[in-house]
Design a protein with these regions (language model features):
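Canonical tetratricopeptide repeat
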Residues: 28, 62, 96, 130-134
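Terminal, low-structured helical/coil segments at or just beyond the last alpha-helical repeat
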Residues: 111-140
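Canonical positions in the second alpha-helix
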Residues: 48-49, 82-83, 116-117
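Register position in tetratricopeptide repeats
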Residues: 35-36, 69-70, 103, 134-140
Length: 140
């Protein structure tokens, strides 16, 4: 019985490891295609990654960037909101959403997201002034 249990655990660990590598495969392929500006292939790979790992916020962020490049605003915003649902303090997603809301003249949401961005920024703090100027310029 102990031997069966031991083999079962080994089999489980090996299959879990293979499954994890398969997940990373699609994400890494997506990043590579995105880097090479092959956005259609990148989109497919990120979508495949999301099917396997629904909580990978990076895949949603890359999808948002792809939809932004392709001027597909509803999908761009939907993917940004998904990133923020998974990680409300994701600076890049907040920054992109703030810029979109300013562009859409939705200043109340842009301001509330900017207030959150100011509190949590650690990597993109230099963008605070840019957003502040955009809010001031477009609101007046």
């Amino acid at each position: 019985m102990n031997r069966f249990f031991f083999y079962f655990i080994i089999f489980y660990l090996i299959s879990f490891n293979l499954y994890s590598k398969d997940n990373l495969k699609f994400f890494n392929l997506g990043k590579e295609n995105f880097k090479n500006k092959n956005f259609d292939k990148a989109k497919i790979n990120f979508e495949k990654d999301i099917v396997r790992n629904t909580k990978n916020q990076e895949s949603y962020l890359y999808l948002a960037k792809i939809h932004n490049i392709k001027k597909n605003n509803p999908e761009f915003e939907k993917n940004l909101n998904t990133v923020l649902l998974l990680d409300p303090k994701n600076e890049e997603a907040l920054y992109l959403l703030i810029k979109k809301k300013i562009k859409d003249a939705d200043y109340d949401i842009a301001k509330s997201k900017y207030d959150l961005f100011k509190k949590i920024c650690s990597n993109m703090c230099l963008k605070k002034e840019e957003i502040k100027k955009l809010l001031k310029k477009n609101k007046s």
